[in-house]
Amino acid sequence: MQFDNIDSALMALKNGEPIIVVDDENRENEGDLVAVTEWMNDNTINFMAKEARGLICAPVSKDIAQRLDLVQMVDDNSDIFGTQFTVSIDHVDTTTGISAYERTLTAKKLIDPSSEAKDFNRPGHLFPLVAQDKGVLARNGHTEAAVDLAKLTGAKPAGVICEIMNDDGTMAKGQDLQKFKEKHQLKMITIDDLIEYRKKLEPEIEFKAKVKMPTDFGTFDMYGFKATYTDEEIVVLTKGAIRQHENVRLHSACLTGDIFHSQRCDCGAQLESSMKYINEHGGMIIYLPQEGRGIGLLNKLRAYELIEQGYDTVTANLALGFDEDLRDYHIAAQILKYFNIEHINLLSNNPSKFEGLKQYGIDIAERIEVIVPETVHNHDYMETKKIKMGHLI
């Protein structure tokens, strides 16, 4: 499929045009027509009903839903993706409420600041959906995408969406969506691209604290940050004056290795080696909450169970339904930019960290190898990292 950039899609939306938004292939893997309520014209919903044919819904922010008393359709939401349907509505000025014109009126009244809860009949023919406050950074759904896109165009936080169906009633995917795009000359974007757009556009960290931290390897300055959209807590150790071409270690949290000194991995040894190096040469350690390459502690323990049955660290993750590495280094890049650092010497054996930082504007001037000894318990793990994951060890 041929996707457009987010800026061109925003321009189309602001011109009153709908666009196609495609979600993750591991999710619904479908395309929705999306329009911004404030900018859409009288033909938008008619076009959705005639050409897309899916259910026409109206994503709104939580503030709008609460102000208009749009309560959840059911108390026990068992939808597989947790879509927050409210009770359906018609505006009181409609007749049957089902015509394209009347559904447009109902949608427009949702964003009218003078509208009140009593102005909507329930049930009706338009289906509001409530978006998560943090948008696609909290949930990668079409609901959140529509509200985020509305905000990015400067409009009130509401949209109208409709799934795209083929002529035979099946859901349009892949090349079907490409043909739909070309036939109707529409912009098409992915939710993944919208997520990356927002990450680059908006600050994601908040500085919270700074203290002196004496350790077995020297005394460091410890900074505490909070991730704005996930509430994760990140700590940073620094030694000496902070400067360009700083020596930097990105260390993914590993409770078993860092705290309990597990010999299944080399994480604890790499952390200690990096602390010694930074203490001697100056630099920074960014300690990221990315347990188990992003799958979390309990899932890492489940992966260990599979490793005991003959899997390796990569195939175990895959068997559990995860990619081999879920880590993203945008938060690390944001922290570096907080300290006005754009060029670093990276303490790492992992090429994916180089690429992960480069895509967020961080230049890697030099790689500093982190050398730690193998143990009888982590030999296979180290070999897998080298052979399957390309680690430079």
From Swiss-Prot:
Gene: ribBA
Entry protein name: Riboflavin biosynthesis protein RibBA
Annotated region (DHBP synthase), positions in chain: 1-200
Membrane-spanning parts: none
Cofactor(s) needed: Mg(2+); Mn(2+); Zn(2+)
Domain of life: Bacteria
UniProt source species: Staphylococcus aureus (strain COL)
GO molecular function: 3,4-dihydroxy-2-butanone-4-phosphate synthase activity; GTP binding; GTP cyclohydrolase II activity; magnesium ion binding; manganese ion binding; zinc ion binding
Classification of source organism: Bacteria, Bacillati, Bacillota, Bacilli, Bacillales
Binding residue positions for GTP: R249, L250, H251, S252, A253, Q270, E291, G292, R293, T313, S348, K353
GO cellular component: cytosol
Enzyme nomenclature, EC number: 4.1.99.12, 3.5.4.25
UniProt: Zn(2+) binding residues: C254, C265, C267
CDD domains listed in its UniProt record: GTP_cyclohydro2
Function: Catalyzes the conversion of D-ribulose 5-phosphate to formate and 3,4-dihydroxy-2-butanone 4-phosphate. Catalyzes the conversion of GTP to 2,5-diamino-6-ribosylamino-4(3H)-pyrimidinone 5'-phosphate (DARP), formate and pyrophosphate.
Cofactor note: Binds 2 divalent metal cations per subunit. Magnesium or manganese. Binds 1 zinc ion per subunit.
